[in-house]
């Protein structure tokens, strides 16, 4: 789903391909030269002026490419189509007659344009190219390569909660109200509403999208799962590669939400994907362009959570193996926090702790901070030595597997909510208390009420524009409770309320969907029904009831888009 907004474009003229594409070269050689020069690895290629289709077909160097040829000459299109069908490639390669001066693609769709049609304006090519997309343009003077820059106001989403500090806020200023679809990828449905969510994790880096999904048939939840890690182009959805995942968590998990640490098992940084390819597997690094294994990290079997910061991987490892009671709650078992070099795999340090509650770890420039089920603790980032341990913090007891606390590191402060115990099981998702500590000493700075967050999911704390945002969105009047939807913005230094407002729209509210809220620097993104864009400056709610995220994971704002 694309948030419609104009993106300013500057084409960058690069080196000439020149005589390397001489007429003496075969179409296969020309295609290899173009792909090498462009540096495009997978995605949608458009050949303008495709002629007889020989070069068009050669441009599909692997299954990770889709190729579309355009030409104004009907006879050439017929010849090209005949050739492509003769080699059994029609579908992955297709051609179409086209004579207009506008291209038949929405903005930010095409990875590579090979242009041999002089009537197409360069500005039109830049419009349809994805950020960092390339146009190779042929003229009487030879070939010119031009690259569309990635807008500085666009952001990635590399971790479950955006970054290792735990603040699920994108810096993407291009994400705006939803107005159209950018692309749709299957499968169309998750497997079951009342069992394990089919979506476990999703991240995005370097113009690619990665997610873990159960592709087994929805006909019966009792059929075996087919978990896969899938890589797609983030702007057009082209499938780049797939890797099998499993054995994974049981699809028979009750009430859809699944273990809350599953989304934390996938991280993407530049051209590398860090993931566990099974429930009890070690950490593996994959080539983001091809899916090939780059490294398997020794000593990391049982990795439950992954964070990456400045070349170092920080892991929560469960070596015992038994992390939960059947389907219901997390067990209190030893966990090992580990730091290792992302390139070499060398372990810098490791420290075993009586418990590290799932979802309760974050990292900043100086320290690793986590919740051990009773107190928040900090370790030195470089050595793993303990720095401090806080006073006791309230939490749910027992801790159900769908739940995790929220811990955010911001401006030398630790913000935390662990969802205090509640005597009513129906209201057990209520947050109740939010704490702020000094990240340097662990000293308590303030505590304030914390309203219920997502239904059967983790807690919400979002820091935007130097305010700490929470909202009373867990449930609705129709479901035995009376959550008002009130939004609060607090001073991170004192906890004082600086902004407070209720929804200004009169609509049906369901319970918040079974995942936590996220945000951008312009909007809180809640899901009391579909996806609500809450403009905290204008104190205005805009509802998009036609789309929502899957249980457990939710939605992801990145690349000027919202993925759901």
Where do the protein language model's features map onto the residues?
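Conserved SAM-binding loop
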Residues: 80-81
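A short acidic, Gly/Pro-enriched loop at the edge of an enzyme's catalytic core
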Residues: 101-112
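A short glycine-rich, Lys/Arg-flanked "PGG" loop and its adjoining helix->strand segment in the class I
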Residues: 120-134
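Conserved alpha-helix/loop element of class I SAM-dependent methyltransferases that forms part
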Residues: 25-44, 54
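Aromatic (tryptophan-biased) beta-strands that constitute blades/sheets of beta-rich domains
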Residues: 38, 94-95, 148, 152-201, ...
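Repeat-blade elements of multi-bladed beta-propeller folds
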Residues: 194-229, 254-283, 297, 301-338, ...
């Amino acid at each position: 789903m694309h948030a419609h907004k104009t993106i300013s474009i500057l084409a960058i003229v690069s080196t000439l391909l020149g005589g390397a594409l001489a007429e003496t070269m075969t179409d296969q050689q020309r295609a290899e030269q173009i792909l090498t020069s462009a540096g495009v690895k997978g995605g949608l290629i458009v050949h303008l002026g495709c002629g007889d289709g020989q070069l068009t077909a050669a441009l599909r160097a692997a299954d990770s490419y889709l190729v579309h040829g355009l030409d104004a000459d009907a006879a050439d299109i017929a010849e090209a189509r005949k050739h492509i069908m003769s080699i059994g490639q029609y579908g992955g390669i297709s051609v179409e007659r086209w004579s207009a001066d506008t291209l038949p693609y929405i903005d930010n769709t095409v990875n590579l344009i090979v242009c041999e049609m002089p009537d197409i304006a360069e500005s039109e090519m830049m419009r349809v190219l994805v950020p960092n997309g390339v146009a190779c343009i042929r003229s009487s003077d030879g070939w010119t390569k031009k690259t569309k820059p990635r807008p500085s106001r666009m952001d990635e989403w590399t971790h479950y909660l955006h970054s290792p500090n735990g603040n699920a806020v994108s810096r993407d200023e291009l994400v705006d109200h939803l107005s159209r679809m950018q692309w749709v990828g299957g499968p169309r449905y998750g497997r079951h509403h009342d069992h394990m969510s089919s979506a476990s994790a999703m991240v995005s880096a370097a113009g690619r999208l990665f997610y873990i999904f159960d592709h087994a048939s929805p006909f019966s939840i009792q059929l075996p799962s087919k978990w896969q890690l899938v890589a797609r182009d983030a702007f057009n959805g082209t499938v780049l590669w797939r890797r099998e995942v499993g054995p994974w968590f049981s699809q028979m998990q009750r009430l859809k939400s699944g273990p809350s640490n599953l989304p934390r098992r996938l991280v993407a940084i530049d051209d590398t994907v860090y993931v566990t390819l099974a429930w009890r597997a070690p950490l593996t690094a994959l080539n983001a362009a091809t899916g090939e294994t780059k490294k398997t990290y020794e000593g990391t079997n049982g990795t439950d959570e992954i964070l990456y910061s400045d070349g170092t991987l920080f892991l929560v490892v469960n070596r015992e193996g038994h992390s939960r009671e059947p389907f219901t709650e997390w067990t209190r078992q030893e966990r090992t926090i580990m730091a290792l070099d992302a390139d070499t795999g060398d372990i810098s340090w490791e420290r075993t702790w009586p418990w590290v509650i799932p979802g309760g770890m974050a990292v900043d420039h100086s320290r690793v901070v986590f919740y051990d089920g009773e107190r928040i603790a900090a370790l030195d980032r470089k050595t793993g030595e303990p720095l401090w341990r806080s006073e006791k913090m309230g939490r749910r007891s027992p801790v159900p597997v769908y739940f995790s606390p929220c811990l955010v590191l911001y401006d030398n402060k630790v913000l935390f909510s662990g969802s205090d115990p509640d005597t009513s099981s129906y209201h057990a998702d209520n947050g109740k208390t939010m704490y702020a500590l000094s990240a340097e000493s662990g000293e308590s700075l303030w505590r304030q009420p914390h309203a219920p967050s997502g239904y059967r999911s983790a807690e919400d704390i979002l820091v935007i524009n130097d305010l700490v945002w929470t909202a009373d969105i867990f449930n609705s009047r129709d479901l035995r409770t009376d959550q008002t939807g009130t939004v609060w913005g607090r001073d991170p230094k004192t906890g004082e309320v600086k902004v407070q407002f209720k929804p200004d729209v009169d609509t049906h509210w369901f319970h918040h969907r079974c995942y936590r809220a996220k945000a951008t620097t312009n909007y809180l993104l809640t899901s009391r029904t579909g996806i609500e864009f809450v403009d905290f400056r204008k104190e205005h709610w805009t509802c998009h009831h036609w789309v929502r995220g899957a249980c457990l994971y939710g939605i992801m704002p990145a690349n000027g888009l919202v993925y759901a």
